[in-house]
Amino acid sequence: MTLYIFAQIIGIAALCCAVCSFQQNNHKKILFFQILSGTLFTVHFTMIGAVFGGVLNFFGMIRSIVFYNKDKKWAQGAKWLYIFSAVFITTGIYFWEGYISLFPMVSMIISTVCFWVTNPKKVRLLMLPASPLWMVYNLINKSIGGFLTETFVLCSVIIGMIRFDRKA
C-alpha cells in the first residue's frame, strides 16, 4: 500500500468522525467527534503534502479541545474566539500558497464561531458556508478524504437540521 493510499484511508476515517459529529444533538459530543476528526485530518493532510491543511487542522483540534472544556474557568471567555481567529490568520499568512489559502483559512474562522456556540441548531446553521470553502482546497490538493468529508458534512448538517431543527 502506498503512502498516498494510506493517507486517503486516514482521510476516510476522519470523514466518519466528522459526519458523526453533526448527527449528535449535544455540544460536547459534537466537539468530541471534531477532536477525533481534526487529529486524523492533521495526519492526512501532512501525509499528502498539504502542510497548510495539516497545520490548520492541528489548530482546529486544539480549538475543539478548548471549546470542549468551555465549562472550566481557563477555557471560558470570548477571548478564545479572537485567539483562534488570529492563529488561523497568522497560519494563513505564514503558509501562504496564494489566494487558495483564503478558502480554508476563512472556513476555520467561521467554524471557530460555529463551535463556540453551544446550541447545536446554530452550530449546524453556521457550518453551511464553511464546508464549500474547504472543498475547493481539497480538490486542488487531491484530498479525496477531505473532499468527501465536506460533501458528507454538508449532507449531514442538512439531515441534522431536518431531524432536530425544523418545526413540527
Q: How does the language model describe each region?
A:
Residues 1-168:
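Alpha-helical membrane-protein topology signature
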